[in-house]
Amino acid sequence: MQASIESTGNLERRLTFTLPQERLETHVGGRLRELARTTRIKGFRPGKVPTKVIEQRFGQQVRAEAMEGLLRETFDSAVREHSLRLAGNPRIDQGESDFDFVATFEVVPDFGDIDVTNLSVVRHTAEVTDADIDQMIENLRLQRRTWNPVERGAQVGDLVALETWSQAGNERLPAEGVETGSSVLGSGVMFDQIEKGLEGLSKGEDKALSIDFPADWRVPQLAGKTVQVHVKAVEVSEPVLPEVNKEFIKSFGVKSGDAEQFRADIRTNLERELKGALMNRLRREVGEQLIAAYAHVEMPPRLVENEARSMLAQQVDQMRRSGRNPGEIPADAHQGFMDAAAKRVLVGLLVGEVARRNELRLESKRVSETLRLIASTYEEPEQVIEMYRNDPQLMSGLQSRVMEEQVIDWIAERAKHTEQSLSFQDAIRV
């Protein structure tokens, strides 16, 4: 195989290679002969379709598929031959001839000796208590609450249906009429000063509030201004919580309606949530230590930029999902994510290096356990498991996640670590 490598930057390489033409022709010929034996075409007996007809009908597609496969195989072989470790996907361009190609890519930086025993890691622990289960049951009651109109003044926990309009200098919002809505006092959905101002209002009462909106407030006409907000309580309702009886318990999937089984199911769910939260804390803890220890190592610029663009895209998608308008995105908006992206890339590459150097292998048992854990959150867990097993992309993502967790655990076990006990609520808090 003809292949040459050159450095075009600290971490960028250019690989020039040539595909073996005879192998391509051999593969194409073999595939066309196979199609001639198996393809049914009107006017010809099975297995008797002339090669010329097969070539005319399938030749272009077969050649393209063969070229793609051989291109990937030849590139991978050249990478192994030159002992290269890629960071990200290569860009492959056509060379001077149909069989010449030029691949440009970045490589994993040299981290030197990776000694995780010098890292200091805090490993958090927590457990689910009966009080946590009681609190979850109370939360479930709140989810199923109904509302009963009252004539008294509104208080925290009440649902207030309201009308509002605002005066910001010479501008009235809305220009005509009022805006209507509702809010549970104390939920934090509305601006805090407005929620406080609603407390004590009875049905039909109104009030003018002087509100100082922050400079980054989502409504541009109000941002950074002192605004007169006029509010009127259209109706005040107090919550009515359901009893924890058999009907209530059955509504959450416990067919027997048994209270002890209900609590056991809640414990299982909370323990699953806690396990994920503790791993996220450990991942963040180990990541911060790795960043502090290896911040001096240069990261592949293109990989960092791609990660920054991905982070921006995720934020825009989250804004749209939550009903917020991300507005017009400047072409360089991803620049604001570059520092965070560089740290994320550093941790990702380091985790990969630790796994490679220490010959850590993916534990299939752990993959199966994680898959069962994910599936258990759905009504039809077996269908979810089957979906993952039949989708290579989903399964690959799961395996990458499990491998990362294995490496994080491996690092934490060998680092200098102390344990810190947390309550369940503190442990799951981001």
Swiss-Prot record:
Enzyme type, top EC level: isomerase
Record-level GO cellular component terms: cytoplasm
Keyword line: Cell cycle, Cell division, Chaperone, Cytoplasm, Isomerase, Rotamase
GO biological process: 'de novo' cotranslational protein folding; cell division; chaperone-mediated protein folding; protein transport; protein unfolding
Assigned EC number: 5.2.1.8
HAMAP family reported for this sequence: Trigger_factor_Tig
NCBIfam families, per database record: tig
Protein name: Trigger factor
Originating species: Xanthomonas campestris pv. campestris (strain 8004)
